[in-house]
Amino acid sequence: IYLVLALAVKKKTNARGATEINELVDVADFFNAHIRSELLCENATTSHPVVRADCLKLLTVFRGFVPRDAELQMLPHLAKLLLDSSNVVHSYAANCIEKMMTCRDYSQLQQQQQQLQQQNSTIAASAPVKFAPNDFAPFANDILQNCFNGFELQDSSENEFIAKLIAKTLRYIGGGGSNASGGGKLLANEVIFACCEKLCKRLDEAANNPRNPTYNHFLFEATTACVQCVDFSPNSQEKQRVESALFPTFLGILARDNAEFTPYVFQILALMLESAAVPAAGTGGVAVGISLTEQYLQLLPALLAPHTWDRQANIPALVRLLDAYLKAAPVQIAQLGYLTGVLGVFQKLISSKAHDHQGFYILNAFAKSLDLSVWSEHLPTIWQVLFQRLQSGKTPKFCRGFVVFLSVLVAKRGAEAAVSSMATVQAGIHEMILS
């Protein structure tokens, strides 16, 4: 196996495996003659784990050159290897399946390049995608079930390769991120709900004692894919089931103030709100307001508390979440008296050269989502803060943010409203700004 790996590979990348091979080595024939039988689970009692792991490594490296049908025939056996007692074998199996999902057919590309060279053509060719999500759909349930069972195997309670495969399967086959894969939704809702509940259990365990950042990251990637797999329209039962599974886990993480996990939680909460308040036809891309449930409302006081924003790593995720709140339910937030707290966050961010652009995100959300009559009383204070910063600490980044905010305000609320509000600070100041 090592001899073939050494002789056959001419070009290789970590992301794609072998992209060009030695024509004198018949990789497909070697796979069928020596590798395929080792990977069949019927040989589990006779095959040595080290040999099986090396066979999985070879298949992973040459996945772009092994015949497509041969790889598809191996999928159910690879899924069974996720339950192999050897940590190395089931980790290699998870990595192999994950890499195959986005594999490209480099054998076809190499043939095309040879033909182009013979024709003295300079046309660049690209490798076609080898598999479609439909090819993996019949095995998706087994893959996901065996992945979660694989966490119970020895030394694999936090196996990052298994966690990555779960996330990839939900995105690629389940439709969580179907824009990238072009696959659409090929998993039943009950499968997605079961995955969501199991992921919450894994997150609860990991939050008590975070040890493996890569494993934790892919758990949250998989959780995000679950959210993207289901219908999150306001009255959807799918939305309610996912929220009922996620909120206890998220609230527990926030209550423990887990520094590693809180940015992930804020981002997923923002995604949930953004998915529920999608732009409707005829609104010019403006999200349709929804009524926030008690689960979301009880988070707002903590989000607006000053100490929440003291941790630098939280700020990008918090800004996205606050922006999602303002776009999803601007009227409700204003009626509940939270605008003053939101403006307090804006003032904190705008005073920092590192985070002033985040403050402008919040201002732009104000201008886009809230009627001017709702927050016009706060505009003089906002202008004072901005003008003071322009005078004392102007930077190119701040100036760009200021111009964008002013443009959004004029486009949404009219030039007259913008000029008159600036005049409350100083008459004619808009002329000085423009000049």
Where are the predicted features?
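Karyopherin-beta/Importin-beta family HEAT-repeat alpha-solenoid scaffold
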Residues: I1-S435
